[in-house]
A protein has these predicted regions:
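Extracellular parallel beta-helix/beta-solenoid repeat domains
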Residues: 1-153
């Protein structure tokens, strides 16, 4: 996927989803798992997502509002401190070629695993737009496992 404005995949389903063997070069988040439990109620939180064997190449090069990480997970809910809107997301065996360090940004998630067979490679292909230095940003989450990531830095 490339040349798509704003984001790549917008996911929302309680059924099992497997995202595998894709190429992402997107101006915003490559994968956005979002929900609206506040106004439109358009989709539910996810319950079982596997993201594997994908190449994420230099995402988030567009407008700063288009993405907060290669994989961004959140929800439009007012009570973020106690809600765990999305559950059971596994990221395994992917390659992240990034100029922006933000790989994953999560809030309101219960159950997330980033396995050690993911590879992170840094590029200088674009100027960094964010001041964020962390690869993994989590807020109001439970049961988050970030195994030792592989990196060339």
């Amino acid at each position: 996927m490339r040349g798509n404005r704003a984001r790549g995949l917008l996911l929302g389903s309680r059924n099992r989803m497997v995202i595998e063997d894709n190429y992402f070069h997107i101006a915003g988040a490559a994968i956005l798992i979002e929900g609206d439990a506040n106004y439109w109620y358009e989709q539910s939180g996810v319950r079982d997502v596997v993201i594997r064997r994908n190449l994420f190449e230099n995402g988030n090069y567009g407008s700063p509002g288009w993405g907060s990480a290669c994989i961004a997970v959140g929800s439009g809910i007012p009570d973020r401190e106690t809600s765990r809107y999305h559950r059971n997301i596994r990221v395994e065996g992917n390659t992240f070629r990034v100029f922006d360090p933000r790989i994953v940004n999560l809030y309101c998630v219960d159950g997330f695993v980033f396995t050690q067979d993911n590879v992170i490679e840094y590029t200088d292909d674009y100027p960094v737009l964010s001041g964020e230095k962390r690869n993994f940003i989590t807020r109001n989450c439970d049961n988050i496992v970030i195994e030792k990531e592989q990196t060339d830095k």
